[in-house]
Amino acid sequence: MEKFEGYSEKHKSRQQYFVYPLLFQEYIYAFAHDYGLNDSEPVEIVSSNNKKFSSLLVKRLITRMYQQNFWINSVNHPNQDRLLDYKIGFYSEFYSQILPEGFAIVVEIPFSLREFSCPKEKEIPKFQNLRSIHSIFPFLEDKFLHLDYLSHVEIPYPIHLEILVQLLQYRIQDVPSLHLLRFFLNYYSNWNSFITSMKSIFLFKKENKRLFRFLYNSYLSEYEFFLLFLRKQSSCLPLASSGTFLERIIFSRKMEHLGIMYPGFFRKTIWFFMDPLMHYVRYQGKAILASKGTHFLNKKWKWYLINLWQYFFSFWIQPRRIHLNQLANSCFDFLGYLSSVPKSTLLVRNQMLENLFLIDTRMKKLDTIVPATALIGYLSKAQFCTGSGHPISKPIWTDLSDWDILDRFGRICRNLFHYHSGSSKKQTLYRLKYILRLSCARTLARKHKSTVRTFMQRLGSAFLEEFFTEEELVFSLMFTKTTLFSFRGSHNERIWYFDIIRINDLVKPLN
């Protein structure tokens, strides 16, 4: 425990005391007004009641904030909005949007200064670089194949928002700012129920989006900080035998002796022998913990995480939120894919002098399969096909122009291919493309009271071009001089697009 506390104190950021005075600067709220709420209209914003608010209200609001009686009355009478000097309710809407946005911008300053305060000669830790979403796909393609067990974790979130405020006390020691944050959270009674909703932690209200995102990211940063400590403690040397182990002990002692005589000379060489038992990647409120070792060791990891949330974050996590599976015998849901790591046999032909023999080599390969049943269910719900996948027309779109109908169907098809381009078996994607293309043809034929064949002959190649995906367009440019070129067999390799992590729901382009 002492080692953990020392590690925690060593890596904590510098405490900040200057945050609260910035809350009374006008430009902070002007910045929140211009960039946080409505980028297209920097001068004024429009509320849900079609009422416009000018940035001039910022100065009046800051003047009221200097008055102590205003804050006392607001706390004593939370149901009565003391910002309302007028009967039209301008300040109530403005207060609920601009002030939390400005507060979020101010409290983000210490975290941004921590990044710029690092000396140039100091290398950024690799673990921080791997927090990007770009690390997800190399993780699956490379390290994932050499691991044995998988823990699929649904990252919990605090039941009470006071826990989030307490987490900020480790990094921001500006007491007035923390009290003001508590005032915001208590003022809006629906915030606590909103953030603990089981639907999604990412679906924030527009006016509170920045503040909630900051609170949630600060919680994730603190959770991953402790997880990094456990990960470093679980590292071990990759051993081949007991003899190798003894040799490496002697070698490590020699390296330590040389490290004392020549400090910093062999530092990078020692890290070469470190082999973490656990690999971690996070996405969309979930996390994957893939590790080596036995089933018992991975169950201990599960209880490590449960105790971590219980003792350091003061809330209980249900054990069922952490699913432990063996990679060789199970599949898991990942970003809309059904993924698994089966063992496949590779037949290798070897020849030594005049002798020819075959060797069976077992190797692991990541399979990412498109969930056909779920996607066909989405298309059926959107009235593009029946439950069994039979294409039908969409009568609600018959009032649109022909090119609008083609554009909508083509955009849906391209979005599906774009999202699931990392699939190792794309037969399901071509089936979905067939359903959308025939549904489009039937919709157009129904609009013009004609047959499908007649209408497709009238459109010709323009009808097919609307359903070309990004992969097909790129490959068609690369192989323009090739006479025999087939889209179906030319790009079986998986293609990962880094922007698919932003797509939360595939049903959105279907509506």
From Swiss-Prot:
Gene Ontology molecular function: any one: RNA binding
Cell compartments where the protein resides: Plastid, Chloroplast
Pfam assignment, any one: Intron_maturas2
Any single biological process term in GO: RNA splicing
InterPro entries registered for this protein in UniProt: Domain_X, Maturase_MatK, Maturase_MatK_N
The organism's place on the tree of life at top rank: Eukaryota
Record has RNA-binding as a keyword: yes
Keywords noted in UniProt: Chloroplast, mRNA processing, Plastid, RNA-binding, tRNA processing
Parts of the chain that traverse the membrane: none
CC per GO annotation: chloroplast
Family membership: Belongs to the intron maturase 2 family. MatK subfamily.
Protein purpose: Usually encoded in the trnK tRNA gene intron. Probably assists in splicing its own and other chloroplast group II introns.
Name by which UniProt lists this protein: Maturase K
Gene source species: Phalaris arundinacea
Gene transcribed to yield this protein: matK
